[in-house]
Amino acid sequence: MSRDDDDDAVYETLSVYERSFSAISERFFKKSAWPKAEAIAGLADNDAMFKMMYSELYYRHIHAATTPSAEERKGAWDNYCALFGALSTGEANMQLPTLWLFEMIDEFVYQYQSFQQFKGGAKRTPEEVSALKALDAKVWDQAGVVGVLQTLVDKSGIKAILERERKGEISFSETEGYDLSSSNVLTVLGYYAQIGISRVHVLKGDFEGALKALDAIDLDKAGLFTKIAGANVSTRYHAGFAYFMLGRYTDAIRHLNESVQNIERIKFGAIRPHALPLLLKKQEQMYALLAMILSLVPGQNYLLDESVSLTLHQKYSDKINRMTSGESALFDELFSYASPKFVGGDNAEAFKAQQSAFSQVVASHATVPKLRNCLKMYASIQVDKLAALMDVSVDSVKASLTAFNSAYTLKEWNGGASALDGDDTYCGDVKVTIEGDLVRVDEEKRVKSVKEVLARANANLKMGLEDLASARPLVIKASSIM
């Protein structure tokens, strides 16, 4: 880490962090722990900050290479509390790569999730149960985790900084939080802590809380989270999943479409090789979410980029057809695959609670695909004839028509300050009006506006130019040293 204002020192730190640590781990500590901080602290004059930073990597490696014990999980928690507590004072006189700072927050939340999965698992040994009981109840407790992250948000003043950026007064995201006149550490940690809080809420099933935590971040513009592949994917996956569970399907599509495109664009060289499998798995999960959305509310393909739509068709056309034909078991299968690992008490019960809520949504949309296919054949049709076509009673088809309009009336974000903002919008390509015993059908051809197409093309061009730029940027990107 750099304790001066030398730009080169930050790049050297990034090189050690990205390359050297993983290379040494692979060669000498593939299935074992690194030496403890106390064993090597003398090499850094027993510097307290060095020991905490080193220990963060030490415990991170233990979680990646071994199965950590309850005591090691506690050690990681204690070290994070000490490290973030020290950094929250704002007195750190060093610059750190933004990649490392994001991954500190990301790993902190991962270890919380890992601990909760360990604690709520059904296959613990008697020794593990005993070790867990011996731990303080606050170790990796949700309130404690959110409290640590919220302290970073509050102490960093990041919300005020992002508000000034929205007004055009500063360019925090453009400089990636890197400032030669002061340390970037607390400010950038505060930024990514918001994303961490959002992720914790998703894991607990609080989807409105997850989106609320992102209020200060403009998710529909390039920002600090879009500069790092892992941050971009994590943010959009969890935001997309939150929208998905809230039934805001067009908003979910917007984020999932963007993220799978981004992974496709960067996977052949712009990210570290060892990070690629995780991103590809997340991409597959997002395709599964998109498949479920298009099965629940058919006709939304126009919102997808052409390449995403084609890949989705290749991967899921058969399952989409089967889901729209009423195979609810496929929804369960894809939901199990695409959802995050929920936490809270018993792991299995936490998942079942979310799956049950989603199953109710699937049931309420059961008649939508078949009814849509029937309606698209007519400009108007008698209710009794429609009932005969669907082989149901007149009362049932009337209820289905009401449910049809409700299913396609979604709350949709239209540029508000909060990710929770939105207006009720009809997103279907078929709209029905019931006039006595007559059903009138208006079919709307939905396409992206010229403005949307041009904006997307401009964004793709800008990202491509960034990747091709030969000059080394002032600030750190995940691809800077690849």
What does each of the following model-derived ranges do?
Residues 1-482:
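Extended alpha-helical scaffold regions
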